[in-house]
Each structure stands twice: as structure tokens, then as C-alpha cells.
Amino acid sequence: GVQKTEVEATSTVPAQKLYAGLLLDIDDILPKAFPQAIKSSEIIEGDGGVGTVKLVTLGEASQFNTMKQRIDAIDKDALTYTYSIIGGDILLDIIESIVNHFTIVPTPDGGSIVKNTTIYNTIGDAVIPEENIKDATEKAGLIFKAVEAYLLAN
């Protein structure tokens, strides 16, 4: 089955800076901005571009231990970025993959809007409990706010 969420957030951080900080440089920034979120992220396949697979060890803010991420698409001109979670205990044994697609849109005031579509592809007709999706969306919001605060301060 497929379950989908769409979230938008506004920021005073300029679009290019937010794109770099939230997506391209997240492995460097997140441990500084929100150390409870991830302990480490290591590339296990690829060079950091499309097709790269990373093993992320999650921090104490998560009830899960690991997730394996694959970078599916990067478009620095359009400010879009897509990655999939393809492994780890975060998939609960009922999810095949979680696809995250981000678009950062510049706003006239020099800030930006982040649009995030998350597609949960479950195994067979498994259904992810609504509270799990709500929890994941809230955690993503906390990560966004932590990265935004870090970028505003640096």
C-alpha cells in the first residue's frame, strides 16, 4: 500500500542557504544543530551524489536505531532533493521504503518555503498506524527548526 503526507514550512533563511543546510550538508550540520537526532552518518556506497547509500545511526531522540538512506535525485538549480529510506529498524518490518521529496521555494522577502512530500510504501497491504506518521512528521519538524536556528546563527 501507499500512504502519503505533505508538509509546508516557511523560513526566514534564504532558499539557497536552506537547501544547502537542510539537504546537501545535513550530515555535517545536524549533529551540531540537534545532536540527539543522529549519532553518525556514513556513506557505504557512492560518492555523495545520486545513488549514494548512507547508513545513519539515530540518536536518543528517536525510538529507532538505524536507517539506510539512498539519494535518488538532486537538482541544485530547481532546489529539489529526493532521498529514500530503504533499510533499518525505522521501517518497522512493514515498510518497503519511505520516499522524501523536498522543494525549497524562494519567497519575495528573501526567505523560503520548504515543501516536503513523504510517500510510505508498505509491504503488501500493511497500514502504518496514523500515530507513527504523526510522530515522524513532528520529528521532521523539530529537525527543520533545529537546522533553521543553526543556519540563522551561523
UniProtKB/Swiss-Prot annotation:
Keywords attached to this entry: Cytoplasm, Endonuclease, Hydrolase, Nuclease, Pathogenesis-related protein, Plant defense
GO cellular component: cytoplasm; nucleus
Xref: InterPro entries: Bet_v_I/MLP, Bet_v_I_allergen, Plant_def-hormone_signal, START-like_dom_sf
GO biological process, one term: abscisic acid-activated signaling pathway
Keyword Manganese: no
Entry's family note: Belongs to the BetVI family.
Protein name (Swiss-Prot/TrEMBL): Ribonuclease 1
